[in-house]
Design a protein with these regions (language model features):
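Charge-dense, intrinsically disordered terminal/linker segments
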Residues: 1-25, 126-129
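Disorder-to-helix initiation segments
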Residues: 12-37, 97-100
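Generic structural signal for well-ordered, non-transmembrane alpha-helical segments
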Residues: 28-35, 39, 61, 65-72, ...
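Helix-loop segments that flank and shape redox-cofactor active sites
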Residues: 36-62, 84, 114-126
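Regular, well-ordered alpha-helical segments
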Residues: 43-46, 76, 147
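Conserved alpha-helical segments that form or flank metal/cofactor-binding pockets of metalloenzymes
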Residues: 55-86
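Long amphipathic alpha-helical segments
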Residues: 80-81, 144-153
């Protein structure tokens, strides 16, 4: 009887720890995705034609700042909620898009997937809110990218 009781407590504790680890990994994975997108955005920016007026070179530079600020905000909220991040936690996930429109489409798809999986607990409302603002910016920059000359590769 006592052995069974302690076994159940340990099982429940393990499940809670697993949930904690899965939640931590969920956020770390998205932060890593953002790191990869920052690298891709910079690569697209550096390879973009530099023309006067409304050009993709300038727009990608602006969008890189939005990506960076969003990543920083999510990472800080993560640490406030789940604890400090390991110093080796960030490892960018590669993005193979070859132009700004394909890139922003990938960002949109994966960000929506992330948003739909954010835990519903009140501890995560800040991350959810920041992600909503980021989705707004994705739509805005998708429109702005479409106005620009986009070099096909």
């Amino acid at each position: 009887m006592i052995d069974t009781l302690f076994s159940e407590v340990n099982i429940n504790t393990i499940k809670e720890e697993d949930i904690q680890l899965n939640t931590e990994q969920f956020f770390i994975n998205f932060i890593n995705q953002l790191e990869g997108w920052k690298t891709k955005c910079k690569n697209l920016h550096l390879s973009a034609p530099q023309m006067g007026g409304d050009n993709i070179h300038t727009r990608l530079d602006e969008y890189l700042e939005i990506l960076s600020e969003f990543q920083d905000s999510i990472a800080e909220d993560y640490q406030a909620t789940l604890g400090d991040m390991n110093p080796n936690a960030m490892k960018g996930i590669s993005c193979d898009s070859l132009n700004a429109l394909d890139f922003i489409r990938e960002v949109m798809i994966k960000t929506k997937e992330f948003y739909n999986k954010i835990p519903q607990e009140i501890d995560y409302v800040g991350i959810k809110s920041e992600t909503e603002t980021f989705i707004h910016n994705i739509f805005k920059y998708k429109y702005l990218f479409e106005l620009c000359d986009i070099r096909p590769y």
